[in-house]
Amino acid sequence: MSVGDKSVVFLIGAGCSFEADIPMSSSMIEKIETKIEKESDWANFRELYFYVKHTIEYGSKLGGILQDFNIESLLVTLHHLSEHRQSILYPFISGYSNDLIEYAGRNFNNIRELIKKVEEELPRWITKSDYKAAEYYTGFDRFQNEYNYPIRIFSLNYDLCIEKQINSNRLETGFADGKPWDGTRFTHSCDDEPDAPIYLYKLHGSIDWERNKNILICSQQQGIKPEIIFGTGTKVQAVDPYLFYLYEFRKYALLSKIIVIIGYSFNDHHINDLLRQALEVDDLRKLLIVNPYELNNVYGRVGVLSTDERIIFKSVGAKEFLSSTLTVDYLSKILPDEEMPF
């Protein structure tokens, strides 16, 4: 078969940056709870926070929903509560529980204040003064040189591990020369020579993105309000680059022969739906799941039977996988001979 630049697609989640000392979502929850218990300016949110947390957990168990409580489920719930009057369901709701009304404060102001405090902390937790621990991300660069075709990395992370470890002239992010984000930088005709061999699509935003009057720029300044989104309900926004990136992920997932998934917990229903669709339309497409920990019901979340041999697990961390395991030969051995793109 012909060899192109679309046979391998990468999808990375928080676990990919864990060994670079970037806290995962569950660790951020621990940080919030420590602040609530130990810092006076957080203490007033204690009852509200734990009420929301326990209600989310109870609702998940009651509905049989496989959803971990994490920073995203917390924030998407708080955002929905803060905007409850804009919901189409608002006229049907006779009232909220007395506990929620008490903890949320007048006009739900406490909810908005808690959102503000959490979102102010998030960039501090993710930003590193030194990205040396993320050196293993250069494995993407090494693989691309061996593969000899452009690669596409779809990231669910807000951190800058890739940007700090891969030379900017080899990495396409949609930004250049201080100009606003431009989606056309990701699209080239068959006759065009791509400007960079590695394309990075940050599906949930980035801590160095800033939006001003609907203009998205990449900022080097400290203390900006980063353009990041949370939770399934808010991730599908009718605004670029989010819609464009989701379209691109669907497009290249459907064109790929193997989707390499590193450190993703399968908690995003929209992403899971796109993975499910990719499996449904091609009986030979593979999912290679790189994670050192056992994941809860991956098969069910992507809509396949537990006997489906297209789902392949590699029980190592991202550091080991990117540093030594990921090679053209390794991926070639996973694919059937007639489907090898190399």
Roles of regions detected by a PLM:
Residues V9-G13, R152-N157, G174, L200-H204, ...:
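A structural signal for short, well-ordered beta-strand segments and their strand-loop junctions
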Residues M1-A20, S25-H54, E193, Y247-F342:
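SIR2/sirtuin-family catalytic core signature
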Residues G15-C16, Y158-L160, H204-I207, F266:
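Short, flexible loop/turn elements at secondary-structure junctions
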Residues S2-G4, L11, A20, H54-E193, ...:
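Active-site periphery "cap/insert" segments of enzyme catalytic domains
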Residues A20-M28, D41, L114, W125-Y136, ...:
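Phosphate/oxyanion-binding active-site loops and adjacent basic polyanion-contact surfaces
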Residues I207-G233:
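Redox- and metal-dependent alpha/beta enzyme cores, enriched for Fe-S-associated oxidoreductases
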Residues D195-I198:
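Beta-strand-turn-beta hairpins that frame and shape the catalytic cleft
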Residues T234-L246, F266-N267:
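A general structural motif
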